[in-house]
């Protein structure tokens, strides 16, 4: 079974993550917490707090709702997370779309105000406890697993988070929703950092897109989600192997990262200096670069 407008909806979720969590990772985690710019920290916090609103608005636009109505129902989920906002916007969006088509002009606006906005918030509120408890439970399991078997956790987390980073999802959104901190978040941050180099080599070897596309994918994989969707096997397999290798190294180096949601190449690397000795971070990052370049090179040979 396929969800209606599934591809467009997932693209909207990725865009919402970029608009909220990516800005938060740069402005709040890096410029704010690491460099000490209070105003920029506020900018990041503002964007991050509206992830649910962004997801609800973008997904309703993606399924064909008029932008004005999409904003109307999207604003109603203010204060909720990205997944509850996304699901509420997606589900209620179809009703709003039907109301647009079948209710006379003028009355459709009143109907959406009276029915659509409250219903969207109600759905988001009902979903929030279930989603939060599920994700936090998973996050707790991963965090405790990092202490009992850090190498295995490095393989699982490093591989999985890097694959999610290249999918039409968001590693930032995933790690933020799971509430990962400590070693698991360090694995996520530096594994994704290493994947930039891996994917640059892989794209070049497989001749996927132009040089501009290669650079864009290396900086932020979500920008080239269409290329990933067209070539899933080589990209996902190579990224899992490279991410797992980086995860093992990071686990062995015992790095930590107490800023959730920083599984993004540049900000993820930068924020590591706030919680670990500089030399240790640089050595580990260099190791991740080498492992990732090797994974990208051999992945390009295998799948060429």
Located regions from the model:
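Pore-lining transmembrane helices
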Residues: 1-304
